Amino acid sequence: KGLGKVGAKKRHRRVIRENNQGITKPAIRRLARRGGVKRTLSGLVYDETRNVLKVFLESVVRDAVTYTEHAKRETVTALDVVYALKRQG
């Protein structure tokens, strides 16, 4: 009687196939320009950048979801993402 939400729900996580090719070559070039790269990039850089970006974003999303679950919410807020990014450094 009146126990409310006792624990975080075990959620089914969807398995996502390898689709990081969605990060296009021009998008990586724009990120590099914003980061201060002036010259053109080597062909090998793009796959490595996709892999690094994937690992970084997975970590940020994992932290943001952890903040959301700790607050016993089901919606990830912008602040959850901000705190997750701050935690990354």
Curated annotation (Swiss-Prot):
Pfam families: CENP-T_C. The keyword S-adenosyl-L-methionine does not apply. InterPro entries: CENP-T/H4_C, Histone-fold, Histone_H4. Core component of nucleosome. Nucleosomes wrap and compact DNA into chromatin, limiting DNA accessibility to the cellular machineries which require DNA as a template. Histones thereby play a central role in transcription regulation, DNA repair, DNA replication and chromosomal stability. DNA accessibility is regulated via a complex set of post-translational modifications of histones, also called histone code, and nucleosome remodeling. The gene is H4. Coiled coil: none annotated. One of its GO terms (molecular function) is structural constituent of chromatin. The nucleosome is a histone octamer containing two molecules each of H2A, H2B, H3 and H4 assembled in one H3-H4 heterotetramer and two H2A-H2B heterodimers. The octamer wraps approximately 147 bp of DNA. SMART domains: H4. CDD domains: HFD_H4. GO terms for cellular component: nucleosome; nucleus. This is Histone H4. Keywords: Chromosome, DNA-binding, Nucleosome core, Nucleus. Belongs to the histone H4 family. It is found in: Nucleus; Chromosome.
